[in-house]
A protein has these predicted regions:
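Conserved, well-structured ligand/cofactor-binding cores
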Residues: 2-207
Length: 207
């Protein structure tokens, strides 16, 4: 969500306050605050970290490599921030439900939540495109990290799609529900073949 939300009076366990152990324990709770949407952003950050490592292993003397490293490092920090932003947004959403707001008002929150996790989806598409643009310049010893970034990044995209599937069950109207599901499906399908080829290319460079 792009709007500023006053969450000072709400009790929120933020990702930034947790260790990996605590975060994964929260994810495992059936009624926990860490949803698939939070996991998608965390996975995206891991993919970005691996991509940055691959670029740094390969050397940043080339302008394209340096630009890619800077852009993906910014994305890594953005994805981590998104984990907490989504938690804060849902805290406000839960408050609206508790206060008995109208269904239309609550559905507005659902659509806003979708917009927020979409930034993970499209940010990851841009990230993998950046890896592809410099793939010929990656050192062989960096390609395992780069290939893993592609694979893990695609998992983050699938998590966004599945979270949208869940969100689609919270709104009324078949058209709206279908549209909420179809957007990530189409975005992922549009790049699947290309990303599979990139993964194979990077894997082959390890031989």
């Amino acid at each position: 969500m792009n709007k500023d939300i006053d969450v000072s009076s709400l009790k929120i366990d933020l990702y930034s306050d947790k260790s990996v152990r605590d975060f994964t324990a929260d994810v495992a709770q059936k009624d926990g605050r860490m949803w698939l949407s939070n996991v998608s952003a965390e996975i995206a950050a891991e993919a970005a970290a691996l991509a940055v490592k691959a670029l740094r292993k390969s050397g940043l003397g080339d302008a394209d490599m340096k630009n890619a490293e800077h852009f993906i490092e910014v994305l890594r920090k953005f994805f981590l921030k998104t984990v907490d932003q989504e938690l804060q947004s849902r805290a406000e959403w839960d408050k609206e439900v508790a206060e008995g707001k109208s269904q239309a008002y609550i559905e507005g929150g659902v659509f806003a939540a979708c917009s927020e996790i979409d930034e993970v989806l499209y940010g990851m598409i841009k990230l993998i495109d950046m890896i592809e643009s410099v793939s010929d310049k990656l050192a062989p010893e960096a390609c395992a990290d780069a290939a893993a970034a592609v694979s893990i990044g695609r998992s983050a995209m699938e998590c966004v799609k599945l979270q949208r599937y869940h969100y689609s069950t919270l709104i009324t109207g078949d058209v709206n529900s279908m549209a909420m599901r179809r957007e990530p499906e189409l975005a992922i399908a549009d790049c699947t073949e290309r990303y599979e080829a990139l993964y194979k290319k990077l894997q082959d460079k390890l031989k």
